[in-house]
């Protein structure tokens, strides 16, 4: 038996399965014949007993109970071998199924590789044709036939003349020049009669902000407390009322040490109501104070943001001539008034 079990290696599983089925069939038939011979007293076939190879010393034509027991044990052994062969067959089927699936995947991959190879071959031929055409165009010097020639010509010979022509032919209106000159005039020249210590007129300003302008700007002004609190810069909330002044001690000590008076529950309720009534008034007063502080702090900012007043700058170079003309006009007016009075 062990030899037969160990033999199941290196040979097809179908041969072992067919052999085990035939052995099981032969032993079971012989066992049933022994049962019939015991029941009827008929003789057995000695050739079948020899084929079974039972460990019997004397093989007789008549069935005995000992022979029946040996046949049953032999049938059990053959059945075990047959069951082991079936298990191996099941494993073989699983492995064969996996092999078939892998073969299908390999076939699909082979098809994909073949299609990719064909596409690669087509692309290669297409690129070869394009390169050959471009080489011909480059050798012939026809820049209009291929894109490569156009790029090379643009890189080798930049069109500087055309760009210069565009710059020269570009028109600029006088209004644009005047407006631009007006914008930069306040920072490029000083006013007539400028003095270094005197403040500048509203139309003129220095090219860079001065110290006074920087000090009066928003960067040098301290923001109000509620703004500091909003950005997390204030350590104490100034808008909340302080309750320390309103809280009274529950014990009042008189002149003597022993005289200690404790307030009743009604008095405590009255004090709490008074404190609750005073809280909104204190909050309103503090909010008004904070608003006044913010307004006072924002006044320099508003003064900066307000547009400067227009100043009439007298740029007359000959004030004496103008004054004499004005005097003549006044004399004429006086003469006319006198004539009217005499009339």
Curated annotation (Swiss-Prot):
Annotated GO biological processes are:
regulation of transcription by RNA polymerase II
Which keywords appear in this protein's UniProt record, sorted alphabetically? Activator, Coiled coil, Nucleus, Transcription, Transcription regulation
Q: Does the keyword field hold Transcription regulation?
A: yes
Q: Where in the cell is it found?
A: Nucleus
GO cellular component terms given for this protein: core mediator complex; mediator complex
Residue ranges annotated as compositionally biased, kind Acidic residues, are: 317-343
User: Coiled coil located at which positions?
Assistant: 86-125
Annotated region Disordered: the residues are: 247-343
- PANTHER family found in the cross-reference section: MEDIATOR OF RNA POLYMERASE II TRANSCRIPTION SUBUNIT 4 (PTHR13208:SF2)
Q: Could you describe the subunit structure of this protein?
A: Component of the Mediator complex.
Q: What does this protein do?
A: Component of the Mediator complex, a coactivator involved in the regulated transcription of nearly all RNA polymerase II-dependent genes. Mediator functions as a bridge to convey information from gene-specific regulatory proteins to the basal RNA polymerase II transcription machinery. Mediator is recruited to promoters by direct interactions with regulatory proteins and serves as a scaffold for the assembly of a functional preinitiation complex with RNA polymerase II and the general transcription factors.
Family that this chain belongs to:
Belongs to the Mediator complex subunit 4 family.
Name of the featured protein: Putative mediator of RNA polymerase II transcription subunit 4
Lineage of the species this protein comes from: Eukaryota, Amoebozoa, Evosea, Eumycetozoa, Dictyostelia
């Amino acid at each position: 038996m062990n030899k037969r079990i160990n033999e199941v290696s290196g040979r097809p599983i179908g041969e072992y399965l067919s052999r085990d089925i035939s052995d099981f069939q032969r032993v079971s038939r012989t066992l049933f014949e022994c049962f019939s011979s015991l029941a009827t007293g008929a003789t057995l076939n000695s050739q079948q007993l020899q084929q079974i190879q039972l460990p019997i010393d004397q093989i007789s034509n008549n069935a005995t109970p000992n022979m029946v027991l040996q046949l049953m044990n032999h049938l059990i052994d053959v059945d075990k071998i047959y069951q082991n062969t079936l298990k191996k067959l099941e494993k073989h089927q699983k492995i064969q199924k996996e092999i078939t699936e892998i073969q299908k995947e390999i076939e699909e991959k082979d098809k994909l590789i073949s299609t990719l190879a064909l596409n690669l071959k087509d692309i290669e031929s297409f690129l070869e044709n394009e390169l050959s055409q471009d080489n011909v165009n480059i050798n012939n010097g026809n820049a209009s036939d291929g894109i490569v020639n156009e790029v090379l010509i643009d890189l080798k010979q930049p069109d500087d003349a055309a760009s210069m022509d565009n710059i020269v032919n570009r028109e600029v209106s006088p209004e644009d020049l005047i407006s631009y000159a007006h914008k930069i005039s306040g920072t490029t020249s000083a006013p007539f009669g400028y003095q270094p210590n005197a403040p500048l007129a509203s139309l003129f300003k220095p090219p860079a902000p001065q110290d006074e302008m920087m000090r009066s700007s928003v960067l040098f002004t301290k923001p109000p407390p509620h703004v500091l609190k909003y950005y997390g810069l204030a350590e104490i909330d100034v808008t909340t009322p302080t309750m320390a002044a309103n809280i009274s001690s529950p014990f009042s000590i008189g002149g003597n040490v022993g005289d200690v008076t404790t307030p009743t529950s009604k008095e405590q309720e009255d004090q709490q109501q008074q404190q609750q009534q005073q809280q909104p008034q204190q909050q309103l007063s503090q909010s008004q104070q904070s608003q006044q502080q913010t307004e006072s702090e924002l006044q320099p900012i508003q003064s900066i943001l307000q547009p400067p007043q227009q100043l009439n700058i007298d740029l007359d170079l000959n004030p004496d001539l103008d004054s004499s003309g004005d005097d003549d006009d006044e004399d004429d007016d006086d003469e006319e008034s006198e004539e009217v009075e005499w009339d």
